């Protein structure tokens, strides 16, 4: 594992602490079907049944999925558990940062990166509008 892959795993650990990451088949399935998942990550040594279930989750909720260059053990160790074959990022900025942290994947999946960039811009715009609204309410402007 090189340094960029290690940084990407550390970003996943940070997303877990921020509660922006679902780990395991059932929580990922719930996040995908409810539309909360922004990116589904599958370990490259996951079983065929796991791949089939992940694809069906993505068809139901429309998030993109990626086969990451980590084994189940590497992915699990980065997240603080024994093994993890499937995890879902539920925050667009984290998903975009993770994909940008792995340049070999980002080059292959430009369309996913563009969609995550668009979603991140929408999130940032909503935060700015909310901040302006709170300021206007505080100072009595309408």
Q: Regions from the language model: what does each represent?
A:
Residues 2, 22, 92:
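Electropositive phosphate-/nucleotide-binding environments in soluble metabolic enzymes
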Residues 2, 6-7, 11, 141:
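Long, amphipathic alpha-helical "stalk/connector" segments that mediate intersubunit docking
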Residues 7-39:
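N-terminal first-folded block
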Residues 26-91, 95:
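Compact, Lys/Arg-rich rRNA/RNP-binding cores from ribosome-related proteins
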Residues 76-126:
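Helix-rich interaction surfaces within compact, conserved domain-sized segments
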Residues 122-142:
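Intrinsically disordered, Lys/Arg-rich low-complexity segments
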């Amino acid at each position: 594992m090189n340094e960029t892959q290690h940084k990407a795993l550390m970003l996943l650990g940070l997303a877990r602490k921020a509660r922006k990451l679902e780990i395991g088949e059932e929580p990922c399935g719930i996040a995908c079907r409810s539309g909360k998942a922004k990116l589904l990550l599958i370990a490259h040594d996951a079983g065929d049944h796991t791949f089939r279930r992940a694809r069906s989750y993505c068809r139901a909720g429309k998030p993109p999925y990626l086969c990451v260059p980590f084994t189940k053990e590497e992915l699990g160790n980065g997240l603080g558990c024994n093994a993890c074959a499937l995890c879902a990022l539920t925050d667009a900025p984290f998903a975009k940062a993770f994909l940008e942290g792995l340049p070999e994947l980002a080059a292959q999946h430009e369309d996913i990166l563009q969609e995550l960039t668009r979603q991140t811009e929408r999130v940032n715009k909503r935060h700015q509008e909310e901040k302006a609204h709170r300021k206007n309410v505080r100072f009595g402007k309408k």
